[in-house]
Amino acid sequence: MRRLWMVMGVLVFLAPLLRGQGPRKFELRANAQEFWKLVGHDARLTQVAAGFGFTEGPVWDPAGFLYVSDETLNKIFRVHLDGKRDTLISLGDPDGNTFDRRRRLIDCASALRAIIFVSTDGRYHILADRYEGKRFNSPNDVVTGPDGALYFTDPTLDLPKGEKQEIPFQGVYRLSRTGKVLLLTKELVQPNGLAFSPDGQRFYVDDSDRRNILVYEFTPGRGLSHGRVFGEEPGGTGDGVPDGMRVDAAGNLFVTGPLGIWIWDAHGNHLGTIVMPEQPANLAWGEADYRTLYITATTSVYRLRTNTRGFIPY
């Protein structure tokens, strides 16, 4: 969602200065003791790599590196833990990524208005680019569901300049392994990040326009039902909006939002916030035990070791 963040990213750094404060610093803000069970008092944030345009869509590869989208430089990079990077593919406005059950890298290709998979040789293949004959808006984020299908959001946040919106709403969709596209909901203004609970019975999606997170009951073969507001992430101008999300194995929700990463328990209690020096857009669990958060935040990629284990849906 580069278009929104190009404006907000500038405000993130200007707003503190206008208030007479210095640039934002890493900080742990707990609202409940449970926060410290997930993020230790001695947690340290490390900058893995810098010098990007706008980072998004981190995915950990068990080979020991990250795939990271850069929406400004129009590339998907392999980012190594020593900070080095190499280009997997040059692609207009890549966004959220995931692996599917076949371990293929799946990307929301906003400029193509499509869901694609990118092979290890840097070639891409379109999996879906239309719903009922009309082109998607600008697919934003994608996850693998408990049934092995792909689930993705399609806001207008990165609709290519000069191109028309063909679908008259911003939807959340299911893409089956046979290529069938099913609309799940069109009630959100700008759907963005999404995730499933570890037991596969809950589906979370945030709305960047309304600054809230919704939760639905999920039933394979039936889709979503009983949607309700799970939590809200209010913030000031330039503080950021709800964006990427991940869950841990215990069902806690980690959502990038105003000032940093908001942590919620499964009951909708806001346990605390990890304040970031740069506004984060997305995050992923990584390393052999999946206890490390890798965070894409504007021009950098960061690493934060936690006390919890991430849930990996593929």
Model region roles, listed by residue range:
Residues 75-77, 114-116, 170-173, 212-214, ...:
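A short loop-to-beta-strand structural motif that recurs across blades of beta-propeller domains
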Residues 216-223, 306-312:
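Short loop/turn segments immediately following beta-strands, especially the blade-tip
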Residues 66-87:
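Beta-propeller domains
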Residues 50-65, 90-114, 132-150, 166-171, ...:
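Beta-rich, blade/repeat-based domains predominating
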Residues 22-46, 166, 312-314:
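Blade/loop signatures of beta-propeller domains
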Residues 33-50, 82-90, 119-133, 171-190, ...:
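Blade-edge beta-strand/turn elements of extracellular beta-propeller
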Residues 152-167, 306:
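Short, conserved, GDST-rich strand-edge loop motifs in beta-rich repeat architectures
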Residues 71, 110, 155-157, 208, ...:
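Short loop/turn segments immediately following the C-termini of beta-strands
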